[in-house]
Amino acid sequence: MPALEVNFDGLVGPTHNYAGLSYGNVASLNNAASFSNPQEAVLQGLEKMKAMHDKGLTQGVFAPHARPDLNILRRLGFSGNDAQIINKAFNADPILLRACYSASAMWTANAATVSPSPDTTDGKVHFTAANLNNKFHRSLEPATTTRLLKAMFNNQNHFAHHTHLPDQGFFGDEGAANHTRFCDSHGEQGLEMFVFGASAFNSHLPKPVKFPARQTLEASEAICRLHNLKDTSQILLQQNPDVIDQGVFHNDVIAVGNANVLLCHQQAFLNQQQALQDIREAYVGNKQFYIIEVPTSKVTIQDAVSSYLFNSQLVSLSDGSMLLVAPKECQRNSAVNDYIEEMIMADNPINQVRFFDLRQSMQNGGGPACLRLRVALNEQELAAVNPDVILTDTKYTQLCNWAQRNYRDQLGAKDFADPALLSESYQALDELTQLLNLGSVYDFQLEG
């Protein structure tokens, strides 16, 4: 059955800030304590969404999470009304409070892993929210993510939703940032590539030394089971631990795939040549499979991480070609820009590039690919999706107006002591749930 891939981009939340919370994420650490501009951030993301819509692609919208997370502050011993809790937390532990204000749910590549219906034995699209338990501020996300997914994909005949994996390091799961699907077309059976950083139980597999491996082999295996994946639709590979120690905290910082193309760095995988051969042999399609391996001599790991070349989106266009959606940092890096120009002139489906200014997200370590969750859907499945989360010209205008009304243009450390930021944020999200027809998905709505 004909199908297409829909990118559901995360709307940046009203409390977007630079707290340097993500150890192993170089950009996040380097920009800690800088002033942020939430309004600019959300509008930059919306501009990218609108550009994809204008290209003829079906584009979805993924709502942000409610922040600050007062429930976790209550669990950690802070009491009183909302303003008192914020005041106490700000005075006792301002870093903790900033973590509870984090807008990291904007990076929906970490929201969940999605398996399309052609790959599953029951013919349904499967979703499992990521537990994200390697980082405290991200571990707060899975319950709300699951509620949002159920509000967006709310038809049991087509969609299966699973509880996130156990909240424990042995099953550390970072979602689609470590997952790519290869196929001849989105409506045909594909090969789902799961990339892990380490094994919790197998001590013989190497591990990074400096930075943590956030995705475990055991988590990836569990997702394959939960999603009822066909044996021929799954392959598990280990990321090169050496590049994790150089700031490649997810596979989507060192590789990106789409349909019958894998674009990866020469050092992306452990035992790379064998890994690439395994992918070629496991590919279930009939089309030529392209592996574009970027040599270190042309793009160093440092350049890959600073430019986020591999955190670009790779999307299929109606004429069968592919577009690389890259951050402007790639254009500013001469080595990376030269390689992109060489690549789009070579014999492969990628024949054009478009650069976007996503500086607000990039400074926290998230490029174009971080901001989107890919969901392949056939016509019946797309018709079953909540239509109000699909971007239209009208919806784009409504969302821009909503953001300009509700978002501040600067946030610094002292602003997190202001209870008005909470009320502004909650009011904005309450309005957004009506705009996207999500119902009650946030704790403050469910408890009110």
Swiss-Prot record:
The active site is at residues 174, 250, 370. One of its GO terms (biological process) is arginine catabolic process to glutamate. GO terms for molecular function: N-succinylarginine dihydrolase activity. The keyword Hydrolase applies. Keywords: Arginine metabolism, Hydrolase. It comes from the Bacteria. Homodimer. This is N-succinylarginine dihydrolase. It comes from Pseudoalteromonas translucida (strain TAC 125).
